[in-house]
């Protein structure tokens, strides 16, 4: 069932997203990591899914292959990511973090965790669980190709 939407909902969500992105970027800059929040997400996906290919990375990030390819080249140039030929399909590459990439990723993840903790600390554990449930419910109602 669909209900009328509170007009304050979208501005509130956008304000939270903007606050989180700005705070994370500020912390990344202060630590001189020369990364953006999407860069951190790329490193996280590669770390969690060692051997991930460019197509799957692009799909998970909702970005086209050309943009992902440029980003991976940039991260390779900084010695954070390395590409290896896929042994089961020589036409594709698998992505891995370098040792330096892993160290930078862990540092950036600590920053992101701290920012998230500060943002959600005013909510009780039950309120946090309710928020997660409500957001999951909204996403579950969307067509698969939109998620």
Curated annotation (Swiss-Prot):
Entry-linked Pfam families: MarR
SUPFAM superfamilies according to UniProt: Winged helix' DNA-binding domain (SSF46785)
Repressor listed as a keyword: yes
Family matches, as PROSITE patterns: HTH_MARR_2
A molecular-function term among this protein's GO annotations: DNA-binding transcription repressor activity
GO biological process: negative regulation of DNA-templated transcription; negative regulation of protein secretion; negative regulation of transmembrane transport
Residues of the HTH marR-type domain: 6-140
Keywords assigned by UniProt, alphabetized: DNA-binding, Repressor, Transcription, Transcription regulation
Consequence recorded when altering residue 126 to E: In strain: 58823, 65629, 55699 and GRR
A single GO cellular-component term on record: protein-DNA complex
Description of how the protein assembles with itself and partners: Homodimer.
Function field: Repressor of the mexAB-oprM multidrug resistance operon. Also represses its own expression. Many variants lead to increased expression of the mexAB-oprM operon.
Protein's name according to its UniProt entry: Multidrug resistance operon repressor
Species of the source: Pseudomonas aeruginosa (strain ATCC 15692 / DSM 22644 / CIP 104116 / JCM 14847 / LMG 12228 / 1C / PRS 101 / PAO1)
Source taxonomy: Bacteria, Pseudomonadati, Pseudomonadota, Gammaproteobacteria, Pseudomonadales
Gene name as annotated: mexR
């Amino acid at each position: 069932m669909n209900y009328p939407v509170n007009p304050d909902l979208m501005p509130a969500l956008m304000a939270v997203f903007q606050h989180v992105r700005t705070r994370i970027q500020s912390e990344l800059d202060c630590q001189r990591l020369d990364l953006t929040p999407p860069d951190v997400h790329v490193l996280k996906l590669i770390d969690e899914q060692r051997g991930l290919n460019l197509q799957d990375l692009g799909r998970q990030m909702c970005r086209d292959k050309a943009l992902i390819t440029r980003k991976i080249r940039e991260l390779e140039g900084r010695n954070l990511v390395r590409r290896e030929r896929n042994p089961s399909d020589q036409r594709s590459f698998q992505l891995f973090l370098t040792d330096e990439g892993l160290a930078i990723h862990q540092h950036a993840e600590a920053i992101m965790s701290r920012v998230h903790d500060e943002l959600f600390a005013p909510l009780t554990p039950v309120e946090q669980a309710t928020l997660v449930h409500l957001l999951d419910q909204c996403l579950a109602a969307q067509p698969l190709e939109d998620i």
